[in-house]
Regions:
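Cell-envelope/extracellular polymer assembly enzymes that use nucleotide-activated donors
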Residues: 2-4, 35
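Hydrophobic helical membrane-anchoring modules
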Residues: 180-317
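A conserved acidic beta->alpha catalytic loop
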Residues: 40-49, 95-96
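Donor nucleotide-sugar binding loop of glycosyltransferases
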Residues: 12-15, 43, 72, 98
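Acceptor/aglycone-binding surface of glycosyltransferases and processive sugar-polymer synthases
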Residues: 53, 62-68, 72-82, 87, ...
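Short beta-strand/loop segment that forms part of the nucleotide-sugar
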Residues: 32-43, 64-65
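Short, well-formed alpha-helical segments that are part of the catalytic scaffolds
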Residues: 12-27
């Protein structure tokens, strides 16, 4: 099979028939063998009924229906598990992503040998409340991930080589960082294509506003930390703990030495415990010890994890 199209959706009953007809037309013109996998993420409208109706007349339509809303990452993960095409295309169901982009995305994967190609909506028809946070988010994501050629990490329109989606795990809210996940899994040839962005035709945006924006940054930091130190927590916690303990120890030695010098010169010196520096030093030593032990426990967990030797292998003979 040439192409699997994975479409996560939530309350998109009006756009589903039109979107499928558009995809089908593009596939037939280019004579691709294909499947369309709709993942209904707990919709409360008749989205699932529309998918079932389409499947009755089209054996290329497959559906997955969640009992409740789990989020886009969960929907993509299940769609990826079911996909069988040589190239996997993801797109949103709101008709803002154009299926006419599929042939060129397919060509870039198959002929130019990209592992992943992400769409770039250079001209957007979204409100400022969405476009401004998106630009700030993408600038940060480029810096943290090291993928400097991508301008739109969260674009729903992407193309993947099949082995990419079978070797990454999309969870939580990590759908925004699939290129970063792919890079960490060893798929480094990542490209970008400027794609046409259309104004929403039906319904309203499901964008979560500033809350989603800040959550995105927290997810990015979590992913970066896990990538850098997930298998070696002692390197970061042990270092920070040792540094804090050392600074606290030096400070408390200075406090004690100051007291001894005053006594040796016959001067009356206040009690060591009367000095605020004593308590500050003691606090730093305690925190340093706790950080060190956190790193030690993290190292024990990492070394005894079932995934500690989970390595991505390109070829074997």
């Amino acid at each position: 099979m040439n192409i699997s199209v994975v479409i996560p959706l939530y309350n998109e009953e009006e756009s589903i028939p039109e979107l499928f007809a558009w995809i089908k037309r593009v596939m037939e013109v280019h004579q691709y063998s294909f499947e369309v996998i709709f993942v209904n993420d707990g919709s409360t409208d008749s989205s699932w009924d529309k998918i079932v109706e389409l499947s009755k007349d089209n054996d290329t339509v497959h559906g997955i229906c969640f009992r409740r809303n789990y989020g886009k990452s969960a929907a993509l993960y299940q769609g990826f598990k079911k996909a069988q095409g040589d190239v996997v295309i993801t797109m949103d169901a709101d008709l803002q992503d154009s299926p006419d982009e599929i042939p060129e995305l397919y060509r870039m994967i198959m002929e130019e040998k990209y592992d992943l190609v992400s769409g770039y909506k250079k001209k957007r028809y979204d409100p400022l409340s969405k476009t401004l946070p998106t630009k700030l988010f993408n600038a940060t994501a480029r810096k943290v991930s090291g993928i400097h050629n991508l301008h739109d990490f969260n674009c729903g329109l992407k193309a993947y080589r099949l082995k990419v989606v079978k070797n990454i795990e999309v969870y939580g809210e990590m759908h925004r960082y699939i290129p970063y996940l792919a890079k960490n899994a060893g798929f480094s040839k990542i490209g970008e294509k400027v794609v046409h962005h259309q104004a929403r035709k039906y319904g309203s945006t499901k964008f979560g506003g500033l809350n989603r924006f800040f959550n995105g940054y927290l997810d990015l930091l979590s992913l970066w930390f896990l990538t850098q130190f997930g298998l070696k927590p002692m390197h970061v916690f042990g270092f920070l703990g040792s540094l804090m303990f050392f600074i606290g120890f030096i400070a408390i030695v200075i406090v004690g030495a100051t007291k001894l010098c005053a006594l040796s010169n016959g001067l009356r010196a206040p009690l060591v415990t009367d000095s605020p520096y004593f308590y500050l030093s003691l606090t730093m030593m305690i925190l340093g010890t706790q950080l060190f032990m956190t790193g030690f426990l993290g190292e024990l967990i990492s070394r005894n994890s079932a995934n500690r030797n989970n390595y991505q292998i390109e070829d074997d003979f």
